[in-house]
């Protein structure tokens, strides 16, 4: 499922609205992932507090959404644009790439909750395709 020019424009336009709340989106999405998919906690066992909204969760959620913001800027070539992040996750952090899809789903849920009027079906499909493409780009170095 590739991103069309219209999808890319939709992602950019929605991100322009959502980016002001990126840290909140990231914190809530990561919190949800850790609760709903407790197996993902294994990657964060070095944190003292894994509870929803804790400082480590907020900090990493903000970092995740910084990566999403970077991906929006590099939407024309996500594989090349996210090469360093792909290498980090594959070789250093050794995150199972299946978790990218899990976190992407939670990001979509939070965006839909936080922006109910803006999260139209068109935005939903464009953001879903974008986050899937971002996940594939992050998984690129696993091959």
From Swiss-Prot:
Binding site for heme b: 89
MF terms (GO), sorted A to Z: haptoglobin binding; heme binding; metal ion binding; organic acid binding; oxygen binding; oxygen carrier activity; peroxidase activity
Positions that bind O2: 60
CDD domains noted in UniProt: Hb-alpha-like
GO cellular component, one term: blood microparticle
Keywords per UniProt: Acetylation, Heme, Iron, Metal-binding, Oxygen transport, Transport
Keyword Cytoplasm recorded: no
UniProt-listed InterPro entries: Globin (IPR000971), Globin-like_sf (IPR009050), Globin/Proto (IPR012292), Hemoglobin_a-typ (IPR002338), Hemoglobin_oxygen_transport (IPR050056)
GO terms for biological process, alphabetical: hydrogen peroxide catabolic process
Residues forming coiled coils: none
Keyword Calcium in record: no
Domain Globin: 2-143
Quaternary structure and partners: Hb1 is a heterotetramer of two alpha-1 chains and two beta-1 chains.
Name under which the protein is recorded: Hemoglobin subunit alpha-1
